A protein has these predicted regions:
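Acidic helix-start/capping segments at beta-turn-to-alpha-helix junctions
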Residues: 44-64, 77-101
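Second-shell loop/turn segments in exported
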Residues: 21, 49-58, 100-104, 125-129, ...
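N-terminal signal peptide c-region/cleavage motif recognized by signal peptidases
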Residues: 14-19
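Sec-exported extracytoplasmic/periplasmic mature domains
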Residues: 33, 37, 68-76, 83, ...
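...with weaker cross-activation on analogous glycine-rich loops/strands in unrelated enzymes
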Residues: 24, 29, 87-168
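Bacterial N-terminal signal peptides that target proteins for export
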Residues: 1-7
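N-terminal hydrophobic or amphipathic helices/low-complexity stretches enriched
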Residues: 20-41
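Low-complexity, Gly/Ser/Thr/Pro-rich intrinsically disordered linker/tail segments
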Residues: 162-198
Length: 198
């Protein structure tokens, strides 16, 4: 009986060592981390890109491009998913740019459109100032001064004081990992594509 008990305890202790390291959240965070190692010039200008799977040149991008490129590591093409959802229900998306129909070149690169998409197809979570409510892989949106929208991905790493999760984002200096979760008013908090792709 003692041998079975020791074997069972040994198995339970070592089982996490054999867990699948390729969980979606791990893939997303690894992709976001990799983005921080690539120099990117902040440029949100309109560009014609391929569809599906289109992207602006690798050396340019904005906050949404960090998210879009990171999700591609999960096999999730937000360009295609946002475009198809906008084609299905254009009125469910903000009318902020004078558009009369979806545009696969730019729609997925606009934070308000991503907010609408994640509300419709992901989990919408609380936007409280409780750092424990923000899990690694969550998406957070903010409104910067001048009501400018911004988006980032919650990291596993914590602030120097251990109080807040760090954020992968691009606010103008290229993709960064920074302690900025509560620096601006939070407009959205979402979880998307981390259990199984919808």
């Amino acid at each position: 009986m003692r041998i079975r008990y020791v074997t069972l305890v040994g198995l339970l202790v070592t089982l996490p060592l054999y867990a699948d390291p390729a969980q979606p959240v791990d893939q997303l965070l690894a992709a976001a981390q990799a983005r921080t190692e690539i120099p990117v010039r902040y440029d949100g200008s309109y560009r014609r890109i391929g569809y599906p799977g289109g992207d602006v040149p690798a050396d340019v991008g904005v906050c949404t491009d960090l998210v879009i490129r990171s999700y591609r590591a999960l096999g999730i093409d937000l360009q295609q998913r946002v475009h198809e959802d906008m084609r299905a229900d254009f009125a469910a998306y903000p009318a902020l740019w004078g558009m009369s129909r979806p545009d696969s070149n730019i729609d997925h690169r606009r934070v308000p459109n991503l907010e609408s998409y994640f509300r419709r197809h992901g989990q919408t979570l609380a936007t409280h100032r409780n750092p424990d409510e923000y899990q690694a892989g969550d998406l957070v949106t903010w409104r910067l001064p001048g009501n400018l929208p911004h988006i980032g991905i919650v990291a596993r790493e914590r602030s120097a004081d251990g109080q807040r999760p760090l954020i992968f984002h691009n606010i103008g200096a290229g993709p960064q990992l920074e302690d900025m979760l509560f620096d601006f008013p939070i407009s959205g908090h979402f979880r998307y594509g981390l259990e199984a792709s919808p």
